[in-house]
Amino acid sequence: MDFTEEFRKSVDPELLFKGRPGDVRLGELVSTKWPLVGVTTRICIVGAPDDLGVHLNRGRRGAAGGPSAIRRELYRMTPPMDKAFEVDPGVFCDAGDMVPGSDITVNHRRAQSLCELALNASRAVVALGGGNDYSAPHARALREVSAAQKDATGTIGILTVDPHLDVRERESNLPHSGTPYRDLIDGATIDPRNLVEFGARKNRNAAAHFAWCRERGVVIRDFSELRRAERIGVRIPDAFAQDLERLVARSDDVMVSIDLDACAGLTGV
């Protein structure tokens, strides 16, 4: 779909924190230039401040505030000790948020369009949610841009850190926060063998959903098995790195999705 200004909102200037003299913060270095025509950065941030998909999945609303909450903390931080930030303060940009409406399918198309624009302007995109249903349109954006830029098939890999598998069936043919990876597999956006469900928990998913994934070759890293392996010397960060390296070797581009449910004390958020 054509992406016009009415579907995008710039970052709230109040979130762009400014430090004292000699104490520069990320809020002073990020570029918020729009449109992204002619922009080339290493990292571009986009937001999807929408939790309609969480509501449709019978979850608690509130994730719509995620992009602003994350930016509020991020832009107070000091820049990394990286020469790139000293030489080029425009090393990363923030393209703002897609503007959600009442139709979740339209919202997803808007998010995909904004993400595609960001991917064309940068080497990597950090997409802030919002409900986890936005993993699907962001993955579609990655596949489309990857195929176009590299004149390739657009083979993507996804490593998702989440206790939930998120392979529920749609209800009333609508996507929601429990459907993203089933939608991506059913829609042939991703080869199921290129999907790693890292940290899935048996007490957070139906047995039928585990079976559905295994029948299709999805790689499941069960949390309890990761913990057992850690006790014999296989650290969880090392297991994560190995899976990521495998996906990089098999794919044109890779997406990492982190759901807050994976954080201690936040299950159900």
Label each region the model flagged.
Residues D2-V269:
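Conserved alpha-helical scaffold segments that buttress catalytic/binding sites
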